[in-house]
Amino acid sequence: MDTATTTCSAVDLSALLSSSSNSTSSLAAATFLCSQISNISNKLSDTTYAVDNTYLLFSAYLVFAMQLGFAMLCAGSVRAKNTMNIMLTNVLDAAAGAISYYLFGFAFAFGTPSNGFIGRHHSFFALSSYPERPGSDFSFFLYQWAFAIAAAGITSGSIAERTQFVAYLIYSTFLTGFVYPTVSHWFWSSDGWASASRSDNNLLFGSGAIDFAGSGVVHMVGGIAGLCGALVEGPRIGRFDRSGRSVALRGHSASLVVLGTFLLWFGWYGFNPGSFLTILKGYDKSRPYYGQWSAVGRTAVTTTLSGCTAALTTLFSKRLLAGHWNVIDVCNGLLGGFAAITSGCAVVEPWAAIVCGFVASWVLIGFNLLAKKLKYDDPLEAAQLHGGCGAWGLIFTGLFARKEYVNEIYSGDRPYGLFMGGGGKLLAAQIVQIIVIVGWVTVTMGPLFYGLHKMNLLRISAEDEMAGMDMTRHGGFAYAYNDEDDVSTKPWGHFAGRVEPTSRSSTPTPTLTV
């Protein structure tokens, strides 16, 4: 702030008042004072806007960093022969998602004025005149794009190790350009039919569905889309034996899984607290130093407690069920707790977040047992984790949302959590959200995946799947075990029959790893 232009000059003001005692001088002095106060007010408004915009940009950077977390998590969860493929698909999700969200997705999500189903204002397509609108800036687009590609990244994990590259390109563009934006319009836009932020206060059940940072909008959308794709494709070769018993196809690197988990954990502090969009906003004038910045801190705490509780619950639960301590299960449990708390992170107490994480862990364990029983194959447990825990998170918000926090964030006297004495209206809205998300994603992504399947554009051949896509589709392995694995010095046929060196001898022999 330029203090020279916002500070009254005592010399100038003294000269005006001492030169004459008539009303003209008094008016001049008053005009001078008012102009200075106006300048100060404008500067403070600019500063507030700049701080809020910087906060949103920083949050967008954190959410985007989650893409690296997704990439590492996916890479570690698949077999070594498909590492390059899955990392390339994560890059593709971000790149294709950026173009489709820029051209169509952002307008479908937040184009206003519009109807309750989908945004349609022309100025939002390709950001044609978006920044010229009052209160809008490019930072909001960047933040929402980071959310959109997160949903696409979730889906890629469910269909890993058996999907053609062109299918990734098609589904990623469609999901980020149409399917996800429509859902985000319903629940986050000021015009959305079920949004808790509707400008006309014509709210679903008098409350709207509270999905603060996207347990449903992001996690359920990505998880259900992945479920559709995995069901159409079927399990990976070797995932179940001839008698139908489950065969573990373990990922090749627990180190990458842990690295990816910590990167996602770090990014979640932009995902959840960043969803306030602004930070310089006061709440209760009777409480000094209390405002939106306090709610941001509380949201970070509830996010942390839910994830950590889910991780610990999964650790001991899986020890009892499986007889060993499994770091992969703990990482997935942690992420399940984060996915669940994302809906109500801003409107619940810290103690309630512990309840959320505890239940989320068992939701994930239960859905994994069900998936095994139904012979459903999801290499990253994405549908169970994001879809199942995301649905629990929406229900949790309907049960535990606190009245004071709901009224701070959403205007008016709203219904709040059932277990907090607020009745069942909010819970009803949350259940409606679960139903419509499952229905919408199923009727859009299901036919897309089925159409790709019928056109032979979805699943790779059995030969490619057995050999590994790194070799057959991407020109080499992600790891060079020794000089003989350097494809730059050997013809392709030398490697066609082997994917990974065995550990039984110092000289690798041709083997197929499933």
Swiss-Prot record:
It is a multi-pass membrane protein. Coiled coil: none annotated. One of its GO terms (molecular function) is ammonium channel activity. It comes from the Eukaryota. InterPro entries: Ammonium/urea_transptr, Ammonium_transpt, Ammonium_transpt_CS, NH4_transpt_AmtB-like_dom. The chain crosses the membrane at residues 56-76, 91-111, 140-160, 165-185, 212-232, 257-277, 291-313, 328-348, 351-371, 380-400, 431-451. The gene is AMT1-2. The keyword Phosphoprotein applies. Belongs to the ammonia transporter channel (TC 1.A.11.2) family. The modification Phosphothreonine is found at T472. Keywords: Ammonia transport, Membrane, Phosphoprotein, Transmembrane, Transmembrane helix, Transport. It is found in: Membrane. PROSITE patterns: AMMONIUM_TRANSP (PS01219). GO terms for biological process: methylammonium transport; response to nematode. NCBIfam families: amt. High expression in root. GO terms for cellular component: plasma membrane. Ammonium transporter probably involved in ammonium uptake from the soil. Its main location: membrane. This is Ammonium transporter 1 member 2. The keyword Lyase does not apply. Gene3D superfamilies: Ammonium transporter AmtB like domains.
